[in-house]
Amino acid sequence: MLASAPRDSKSAPRIVPALIAMSALQALVACAIFAPGVMAPRIGIAPATLGAYATAACVVAFFFTFAGGQFAGRYGSFRVASFCAVIVFATMGIAAWSGASPWLAIAGVVLGLAYGPETPASSTILFRITPPAKRPLVFSLRQTGNQSGGIIGSLALPYLAAIDPLYGYVAIMLLALLALGAFELLRPRYDPLVRGTGSGVALRDALRILATNAAMRKLAIASLPFSALQIALNVFLVSYGVTQLGLDLVQAGLLLAIAQAGGLVGRLSFGLIASRFLPAWTTVVALGFGMSLCAGVVALATPGWSWALLLAVAFLFGVTASGWNGVFLAEVARLSPEGRVGEATGAVLMFGFAGLVVGPLLMAGIAASSSLSVAYAALGLMTLLATLVLIRAPVKDSPPA
């Protein structure tokens, strides 16, 4: 079984190196996910092809997210991280070869092998080495990797794509190699803490956690539209800015970078709030209402809006739609049965990845028949309905530390 956080601070591994490494892993995967979307206007990737890439990644991730907890328990969290870095390297190579062709979906399939396992594997080691009072903040800090990757990609990739679209993919491949080396250096120190805890756990046993825990079921249900709206922000905002708001590629990339910066601020702020001031459950509910409202405002945006207003809306959209993950995962870990954080996280995230599958499909489908504005409004409504399910807190809410 997975023990609680070590009490002996002298013998316990330091939290900071593991936290930085696992955040870097998420940033690397995020760069790989965002790359085709950010460079789409330059390369000429159609929304349908872009949606196929994101959907393929999320479908595969849906099936492999539970395996992340198992693999971390069997081989170690950093061994899984190394595997994910290799997968990102391969994905970018395939994407570079595919260009704007439908073969880009194959790159998405490969990326899903990293996208699914990385979060449960990270949760397993961070839960193991982090004191309970610090978990909301630590998990939120870890989730800032998504924003860090998004900001770097949104700012750097458009300029690289202006020179040659291949340069963006090659840059991410080089980062993957650097990450692989770092993960292998840290692996001997951290992996023995969790190795041997994940074998023999069946998917049905992990899903039984949801069947017997009403609070976990609610979180699983909410993670579907929450994730759908988040990926809609990350994958389609650049295309939305260019095609419907009249922005050029660099401006649209900056808009996404501002949204990612908002997500970074949100994850840090809400992690601190849930650690010290409000219960994590209440914080998640507030974020659900906030992202629903922001999606509606984005749907109303027009080319006549000022640049400052667009930046402000993008920032707030990022604060909410990309700021919920850390507090959410900390609450999942808190509600998990003793020793089963990885499996429980994987079980809940299967619903989240279902949302990541549904999101691009809905966005592409609605955009084809109507517009991206209507698509954002539809996902905002879905998120609002899911948030209403969360209003009633669990019997044992998580008090601020």
Predicted regions and their residues:
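Extracytoplasmic gate region of multi-pass secondary transporters
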Residues: P36-G37, A215-A257, L264
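Cytoplasmic helix-loop-helix junction between adjacent transmembrane helices
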Residues: A107-N146
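Helix-to-loop junctions at the C-terminal end of transmembrane segments
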Residues: T65-G76, G266-P279
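Conserved MFS/SLC helix-loop-helix module at the cytosolic interface between two early adjacent transmembrane helices
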Residues: F63-G99
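Cytoplasmic membrane-interface "Motif A"-like loop-to-helix N-cap segments
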Residues: R74-A85, S275-F289
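Helix-loop-helix hairpin linking two adjacent transmembrane segments in secondary transporters
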Residues: R142-P188
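Juxtamembrane intracellular "pre-TM" segments in multi-pass secondary transporters
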Residues: L2-A12, Y190-A220
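C-terminal transmembrane helical hairpin of 12-TM major facilitator-type secondary transporters
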Residues: W281-F328
